[in-house]
Amino acid sequence: VGVDGLAWLKEVKKETGMYVSTEVATSKHVYECLKAGIDILWIGARATANPFAMQEIADALKGVDIPVFVKNPVNPDLELWIGALERINNAGLKRLAAIHRGFSRVASSHPEPADHLRSQPHRW
């Protein structure tokens, strides 16, 4: 939908008073969202996994006070996720949330019953 969708979110905000949020993956997305008055931004798993994309987004957010949700990368790489959060924090943003959506599993020669699930059930 792109930029046209931002107008719809703006209308939702006006009619309901609700906060509106959308995903950003580039600096252009950030600028368009800020221009449209989006209240909360989130960064998806693929952008989180790309330090170059994260730095571009962080640079676009310098001097802005907006909540940012950062989803975990698809693969279980905690340092990559922390690095993404640090880049946003180093740009001056303080209202951050780490959103865990689960990790993909590498194919195994010993498949588990729940291998089709993105977030594996915890084993007690």
Give a label for each model feature.
Residues 1-4:
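Glycine-rich, proline-tolerant flexible connector loops at the mouths of alpha/beta enzymes
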Residues 12-15, 36, 44, 60, ...:
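Mid-sequence acidic-hydrophobic segments that form the walls
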Residues 12-19, 122-124:
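A structural motif corresponding to the C-terminal end of an alpha-helix
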Residues 16-26, 30, 38-53, 66-78, ...:
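Catalytic beta/alpha-barrel core
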Residues 33:
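Conserved structured catalytic cores and adjacent interaction surfaces
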Residues 54-124:
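Catalytic alpha/beta core domains of metabolic enzymes, predominantly
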